[in-house]
A protein has these predicted regions:
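Helicase P-loop NTPase motor core
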Residues: 27-30, 35-128, 151-155, 187
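Well-ordered alpha-helical segments embedded in enzymatic catalytic cores
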Residues: 18, 84-91, 145, 265, ...
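Short alpha-helix plus adjacent loop in nuclease-associated cores
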Residues: 5-10, 39-40, 130-154, 166
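RNase H-like polynucleotidyl transferase catalytic core
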Residues: 33-34, 127-136, 358
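Conserved helicase C-terminal RecA-like lobe
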Residues: 101, 115-127, 140, 147-389, ...
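Conserved helicase NTPase motor core
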Residues: 1-20, 36-40, 239
Length: 428
């Protein structure tokens, strides 16, 4: 059994051609199409079928159901990502008042960095949620590392922060040396960083370790001076670059790109706060309130992670060209990448049993600047008879039907340095 329309793991080596070539590879085999659907309503199936029909390489089938009830797929345009999070949180609360359980609702994102806005909004409104397939945003290792740098810049007395990042990235400061520093600090009632300042002028540690620690202290002092006159989010970008943390993630071909996207989202979210102190207090509050959810919780996950699952109500945010479909996928594999992205959209829509909500933002904050986005071409491929559109004043729900994304993420991102060039802003 296989479904060419749900082949979404090309980046893992899964070949949709294996299904498309089946009749050639096994001549005489009988093909049985399973087209009757018992999960979704006719409007959801109609929208999904109309969307996937735009793919050139597929065997072709039309899903149908006897269930003619249910709402049309709702397509909403909003001003920016934060407005999108507010909209979906409001829709969740409305559905809950109508008797829908939290666990019967899911938010399916294209990229993990999108989760941050929804997590923070849900915490603020005391909406229980669970991130499926990975840790919550502020619990991710790269986010905790970044926060540890900020906390140590803000306060030399934060020994937990010191212990976390004194050798991240690797500086040649081994665990034995770190434990010796912490022991000495406790023995003399000092902070770990104060103890280091004394140790680097003695011969109690190896010369190589003392040099590494001296460089670390010098970097911290420089970043602390920078924080006195520079916006805190720019300080964060500088720390990630100068510490070697960004380069460490670039070297990780398995998950480094995802971590860099999360760090990018982190620096952008910091811009909503006037000071570093205010930001860190906000993080502490969110972490304190976010004690984990019980069984009845909104499910947040990536579209890839949602394959095989189903929910009565599904929210599909971020349907903007360049974000979804992913510009990187299209750049890497062209039409094949676009078609796999479309299959991913099809999977997302068909996770919904009763209601599906698609949303797109007119603006996304990128590298400290607002970037104008256009609705995903997938929005324009949804059959009108199966959707209900609603946009904020001045926003359009109709995308420009271009491959590279004229005016959207595809072109606007080109004006900024990619993470291949670090956390830069517009090139000079």
């Amino acid at each position: 059994v296989g479904d060419d329309d749900q082949s979404i793991y090309g980046w893992r080596g899964a070949e949709v051609d294996n299904i498309l070539r089946f009749e050639r590879d096994f001549p005489g085999a009988k093909i049985i199409k399973l087209e009757r659907n018992y999960r979704s309503t006719s409007h959801i199936l109609g929208a999904a079928s109309g969307l996937i029909a735009a793919n050139r390489d597929r065997l072709g089938k039309t899903l149908w159901t006897e269930d003619d009830s249910g709402d049309k797929v709702r397509v909403r345009g909003v001003w920016d990502g934060e407005a999108e999070a507010r909209l979906i949180a409001d829709e969740v609360e409305t559905a809950r008042r109508q008797g829908v359980k939290y666990s019967d609702m899911a938010v399916l994102v294209r990229a993990s960095f999108q989760m941050r806005a929804f997590e923070e909004r849900f915490v603020m409104l005391a909406i229980p949620y669970a991130v499926i397939g990975g840790p919550r945003f502020f619990e991710r290792a790269e986010i905790r590392d970044a926060h540890a740098y900020l906390r140590l810049i803000l306060s030399e007395d934060d020994d937990l922060a010191f212990e976390r990042i004194v050798n991240v990235p690797k500086r040649g400061i081994g665990d034995t040396s770190v434990q010796k520093i912490l022991h000495l600090a406790r023995q003399h009632d000092l902070s770990a960083l104060t103890a280091v300042r004394g140790l680097i002028n003695t011969d109690e540690l190896q010369a190589r370790t003392r040099t590494a620690l001296a460089n670390f202290v010098r970097d911290l002092d420089r970043w602390r001076d920078l924080a006195a006159s520079t916006p805190h989010w720019q300080v964060m970008e500088t720390v990630l670059e100068e510490s070697g943390y960004t380069d460490m993630q670039k070297a990780d071909r398995t998950s480094g790109q995802t971590r860099l996207e999360n760090l990018k989202e982190l620096t952008q979210s910091m811009q909503s706060f006037e000071t570093l102190q205010a930001y860190l207090e906000h993080v502490a509050l969110v972490m304190d309130l976010d004690r984990g959810a019980g069984d009845d919780a909104v499910q947040i996950m990536t579209l890839h992670g949602a394959k095989g699952l189903e929910f009565p109500v599904v929210f599909l945010p971020g349907w903007e060209d360049g974000l979804f479909p992913s510009q990187r996928s299209m750049d890497d594999t062209g039409i094949a990448g676009l078609e796999e992205e479309r299959r991913l959209a099809y999977v997302g829509l068909t996770r919904a049993r009763r209601r599906a909500h698609v949303s797109h933002a007119a603006n996304r904050r990128m590298h400290g600047s607002w970037v104008t986005a256009i609705p995903s071409r997938f929005v324009g491929e949804l059959p009108e008879q199966h959707i209900e559109t609603d946009a904020a004043p001045g926003l359009s729900a109709a995308p420009a039907p271009t491959f590279g994304g004229a005016g959207g993420f595809g072109s606007s991102f080109g004006g900024f340095r990619d993470f291949g060039g670090g956390f830069g802003s517009r090139p000079q």
